[in-house]
Amino acid sequence: MTIYHFVGIKGSGMSALAQILHDKGFQVQGSDVDKYFFTQKALEEKQIPIMTFSADNIKEGLTIIAGNAFPDTHEEIERANELNLPVIRYHKFLGQLIDGYTSIAITGSHGKTSTTGLLSHVVGAIRPTSYLIGDGTGSGTKDAKYFALEACEYQRHFLAYKPTYAIMTNIDWDHPDYFKSVDDVFNAFETLGKQVKKAVFALGDDVELRKLSLDVPIIYFGFGSENEFQAKNVKKETTGTKFDVYHRDEFLASFEIPAYGDHNVLNALSVIALCDYEGLPVDEVKKELKTFEGVKRRFSITEKGNQVLVDDYAHHPSEIRATVNAARQKYPNKKIVAVFQPHTFTRTRTFLQGFADSLNLADEVYLCDIFGSAREKTGNLTIADLAHKTKGNHIIKEEHTEELLQYPEAVILFMGAGDVQKFQAAYEKVLDNEIVANEVLKKSAIN
């Protein structure tokens, strides 16, 4: 039996796919840079070997699954080609894997990971379901009928998939290093839609998604009355959100989610619509929606002392706006402080004013240096260009996060798609030291 070797196994999709193959009984190993990523925890728990990149890792008998961040000139891929080993790109392998399942591809400019996680949680509790989530979580469930997968639009990789269903959460212009306009993004989504076998569930409040012309039914969901599935009577509370769902103007049921913001209502509505279409019991769907704890790096909350720290993947103006609004719903009486690390120079330059406008919805703004991607290490833009447009013109360094101590009782949002977590980790150490120091002072005062 072949051993599957993942080049770039710590990538979020790659880590999830490796876990799926492992669960299905295959031998799996992989390699990556010698740096800790949150995605490797699950790999280590399943005892999947992780090596540091080296051509010496590549031997006879391996099948290579190559991450899309790595070119054909990568040392391991070159060695594999020299040995005439099979080399398959991640998205192409996944496209082959989902055949034979009732597959559900979740895509959209924003909300893919959260919606895939929610769908996997709900459907997986009702019927056997395998899933691949973009937070590095994957499961190859035995006897699975369904396969839920996050489908990334970047470089049109999702066109390797021919799913049974697709959920399209929205269309927005992102990845400006590849997509030239929102029309370019739309064309990619419509092409995917034409490969779907059974039905597409699309946000009907989205102007771009309303333009879709497909051969399969399009089931629209949203807040507007023109949608087949409509969310009404939304009640936003500090413990979550309640709403009613109407199907073709007929009351379906009332639902409750432990999540915040309109975007999470819409994510849930897409899952409700698909479950209804598949005939899954509405009472079970209601029950599972109430217990979803979220996915990694999506409004992940840590309470330290009197402050609330939130880790979130938001890296586009629309996502930052949604995260700030969600924080205001859950913590209406607290100050909101945004700590943001822009991801890629191209995206930062393209959406500079949009970033400023979204960040300024927070009460205070702190900016980290721009995180260059593997494809783009430098640019002729600096973080100062964005700082000049935001409240306070604050730039924060990893070694000086103590500046955030001046906001007691605040919610600190650490946002970005790079390694903004290291800023939160540094600040948590500062907070721990502060808490210990305060305890010492209290004891001294008592004595």
UniProtKB/Swiss-Prot annotation:
One of its GO terms (molecular function) is UDP-N-acetylmuramate-L-alanine ligase activity. Keywords: ATP-binding, Cell cycle, Cell division, Cell shape, Cell wall biogenesis/degradation, Cytoplasm, Ligase, Nucleotide-binding, Peptidoglycan synthesis. The lineage of its organism: Bacteria, Bacillati, Bacillota, Bacilli, Bacillales. It catalyses: UDP-N-acetyl-alpha-D-muramate + L-alanine + ATP = UDP-N-acetyl-alpha-D-muramoyl-L-alanine + ADP + phosphate + H(+). InterPro entries: Mur-like_cat_sf, Mur_ligase_C, Mur_ligase_C_dom_sf, Mur_ligase_cen, Mur_ligase_N, MurCDEF_pg_biosynth, UDP-N-AcMur_Ala_ligase_MurC. Pathway: Cell wall biogenesis; peptidoglycan biosynthesis. Transmembrane segments: none annotated. ATP binds at G108, S109, H110, G111, K112, T113, S114. Its EC number is 6.3.2.8. This is UDP-N-acetylmuramate--L-alanine ligase. It comes from Listeria innocua serovar 6a (strain ATCC BAA-680 / CLIP 11262). Cell wall formation. GO terms for cellular component: cytoplasm. Its main location: cytoplasm. It is found in: Cytoplasm. Belongs to the MurCDEF family. It is an enzyme of class 6 (ligase). Pfam families: Mur_ligase, Mur_ligase_C, Mur_ligase_M. Signal peptide: none annotated. The gene is murC. GO terms for biological process: cell division; cell wall organization; peptidoglycan biosynthetic process; regulation of cell shape.
